[in-house]
Each structure stands twice: as structure tokens, then as C-alpha cells.
Amino acid sequence: MQAKYSFPEKNAFRAREALDTDFDIDVHDPKLYINLDDIRILSEETDYKDSLYFMLNIDPDTQNLDTTAQDYSKILFLGHRGCGKTTEIRRIHQYLNNPNRYFAILIETEKELEVSKMQAEDFFITMVIKIIRQLKNAGLSGATDSFDDLLKEWLNDTEVQKEITNTAGVEGNASVKADTDGNILMKALSIFKFEAEIKGTLARESKTTTTIRSKIKSNLLDFITKFNNALAEVKEICASNNKGRDLLFIIDGTEKSTFEFYEEVFQKNGHILRSLNVNLVTTLRLDAFYKLEGKPNLDFYESVFVPMITVNDSNKDVLAQIVTKRIDANSFFEPEALAYLVEMSGGSIRQLLRLANQTLLFSRGKKVGLKHATNTVKKEGEKLYHALSPDQKELLKNKKWVDNWSHPDASMMLYAMALLKYNGNAKINPLIQSYF
């Protein structure tokens, strides 16, 4: 049973939960959202949303999709862990998923897949299943038939068909198509399209999983052709039913994937994404981006960076609201203690929440003073510093990371947040600044 919260929370235990870095504000209360654009975007050059919308052919004056362009945008949405990418990308999806813009499909991979086990082919399987299910939810179930040729190829194996139908307990399932007439392929097709739990299906090394992955890998051209044919049909159906002028996939949550996964999808198989006749925005780990930058197939992506927030006196109160909207500040924080945590967050939402959460732990729920806040910052800084290798410490000491982000140590320090990148510049995380 989901806990009931009363924001700003006054119960110490629920307050700590609300300050957890994985606490989903959109699930618990969207009103907890803080619009940070005014303090994040410092110039036209750093207005990442306007840049993204223009790349996607959204007319700045009408705010509608201009359909005169014939190309398909493939955009990398980049930023530090905890800078607010997921929160912002959900709102970007809400804006773009509009009859005058796009039929936009949001895929949050952490919800849909076991990200740490995700393989390159799973990326494409999930795209197919998610657009099918969103079409059904939009009242366009008939449009999902456009994908049947592709899915029949995937499921054209008796063992796969039996595995899918047995897993679903098909005999007693009324939602399976009534006109299957004992055709196990059609039963399996219907279940796979509308009912199969994606995370469970792809997490297991089942016959279904290995067969579909193998078919995509061994015949990429066939997959691309059939997927593109289906997308072309669906695009016309969406437009004629006033559901969107074009199609757009937005993919988030791959940060726990291995570097090898990124290399496989975005570089080695980058030509597949390039060949798909659909617009795509996807997040990418910052360190992976710099490691892959300049390699074949990376040059056709456009990039949008969500900049870190530079903390200063004019925006500290706004950043503090990330905490004070969730918990009652008067119950848990002396003003100077919270102000200190904001300053030491480096403008990272994730780091601010982590510091506030840990400080509340160390105080055992009592009101936090500056001493508790200082001790928390010291402990968190020690952990980050001791996790660095000698070579990484040397890079930080001599500032050798500048203009050398492809270096494995430099790029990994971005991922670990030992280095924080602000609008093109990078600084050492304030938690460990005193060591250097």
C-alpha cells in the first residue's frame, strides 16, 4: 500500500522518504515540481528547450509542428545524473504530445526494462510494443495492425507461441482476440501486442527473448523495412484522426546501462537509428557521450544539454524550495543549515536531496543546525574523494580534464559527479573542493 504524504511533510520518517533521490514527485504530487528554467537558462544559447523544439521543427511563433521538413531528427538529451532530466523530459513530452505537434511516445526504460541487463535489440523491441499500446490507449487499436507483419516474423516459431500463450494463461483470458479460431500464432500475437509484461519478457533469457533478439540482429534490413512501413501507415492514421502531425519517440532512463550497451546502440548500430523514419529524442549518459564523441555514426545526432545550475545569492531561495516543498523546513532545518546545503549542492538537485536526506538521518529527525549540515557535507565529501583513483585525483589537482573529456578518467568523473559541468564550463564538486 502506497504511503500517504502530507506536503510539506512534518513526520520525520516520511520526510526522509520524500527527500530520497528516487522519490517520484509525479507519482506522489506533481505540485512538488519546481520550474528551474529561469535560473538554469541564462541566455538564448543555453535555452535547451527552445533548441530542442526547433530541432523538432516546432515553429517558434505558432508553437505548431511545421511538416515541410523531410528529414527525421535524432537528438541526444544530455546532462548530469540528478540535474532534472527525467522531470523535464516528462514535461517536454506533455507539451509535444499534442494534435498540432506530435503523437509522442514516452519510454521510461527503468520502468519498462531491467536496465542493467538491457541489450541493444531490447531498445527496438520496446519501441514497437510501446507505440502499439499507446495507439490502443488513444483509441486507435486498428492502427496497431500495421505492425502485424513485423510481429509475425518475430513470433513465427511454435515454441515461442506456446511460451507466450502459456505464460499468459490464454485459455481463460477473454481479452485475447475472439477470432483466432485456434490459431496459436494469432493468439500469441494479440498477447504480445497488448498484454505481455515487457520487463518480465525481456528480463528472462526465455525462448521468446532470445529468438526475437536473434531475428533482429541477423536481419536488420528486414526489421528496418517492416518497422518503417508500419510507421508510415501509423503516421497517416494519427494525422487523419487529429492525434498528431508526426510521430516522436522520447526515451529516458538508460543511465544504469553499461557503456557497452551505449556503444552497441548508438555507435555500432547507429545506422539503424539513422535508418528509422521517425523522430527520436533519447537520454544518454554524459560520460558515454564523451567517450563515443567523434566515432563513426555519432556525427548525425544533434545534442541538447540540460545545464547545471550555478548557485548564487539570487537563486538560493529557489533551489531551497526543492526541499521545502517536500518537507516542513521549520520543523527540520535551521535557515543557515539549509542555505549551506544548497550552496554545497553545486546546483545538483540529486546532491541537494541526498545532503538533506543524510543530514536528517544524522540528526535523528531533530531540527538540523549548521553543525549537522557541516558534518554531513564532510562525510559525503570524504566518500566521493576516496572513491577516486590516484590518476583521477591527479587530473583534478592539475586541472588536466579541461578539453579532454574523452579521457576515461575525465568522463567517468562527470558520471560520478566529481566534476560538474555548467554551460560549457566544468568545476570540481564543492563537496571535494577543499582537497584540491
Regions found by a protein language model. Give the residues of each.
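Gly/Ser/Thr-rich loops at beta-strand to alpha-helix junctions
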Residues: G82-K85, E255-K256, S345, I349-R350
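The catalytic "switch" region of P-loop NTPases
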Residues: N11, K49-D50, T210-V342
